[in-house]
């Protein structure tokens, strides 16, 4: 996987207000929330994450596809990044959130290969 920006996400403690704002502003179709409060935006181009369980932070973030999330975390830390959300494996993807040395939040991710 080339290291390209290929997904975005909006984190919010008020997903109903975010849905109203972004749906109204850009005409995005926003799916009903999953059991963990995640909504797909505009056919999967991005996501809206209810961050209440994560302390209620708000963010806008871009994701870069990588071959190895853990190795990329280590490389980023060596270059001065901080881990904001450690590697999460949700069964379909692995991802993490980091902050660059200037404090900008970004994500890295990779799809999981189906077993078999």
Model-derived features: where do they sit?
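Conserved short beta-strand elements that form part of the metal-binding/catalytic scaffold
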Residues: 27-59, 105-111
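Short beta-strand micro-motifs in enzyme catalytic cores
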Residues: 6, 37-39, 60, 94-96
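N-terminal beta-strand motif that seeds the catalytic metal site of vicinal oxygen chelate
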Residues: 1-19, 44-45, 59-64, 111-116
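Conserved active-site tyrosine of GNAT-family acetyltransferases
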Residues: 18-22, 76, 103
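N-terminal first-folded block
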Residues: 7-41
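Short, conserved charged micro-motifs
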Residues: 16-17, 69-73
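Vicinal oxygen chelate
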Residues: 3, 10, 73, 79-116
């Amino acid at each position: 996987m080339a290291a390209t920006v290929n997904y975005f996400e909006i984190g919010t403690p008020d997903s109903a207000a975010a849905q109203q704002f972004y749906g109204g502003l850009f005409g995005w179709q926003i799916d009903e929330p999953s059991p963990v409060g995640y909504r797909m935006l505009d056919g999967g181009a991005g996501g809206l994450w209810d961050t209440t369980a994560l302390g209620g932070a708000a963010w806008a973030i871009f994701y870069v596809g990588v071959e190895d999330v853990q190795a990329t975390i280590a490389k980023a830390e060596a270059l001065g990044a901080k881990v904001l959300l450690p590697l999460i494996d949700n069964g379909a993807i692995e991802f993490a959130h980091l902050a660059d040395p200037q404090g900008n939040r970004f994500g890295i991710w990779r799809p999981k290969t189906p077993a078999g």
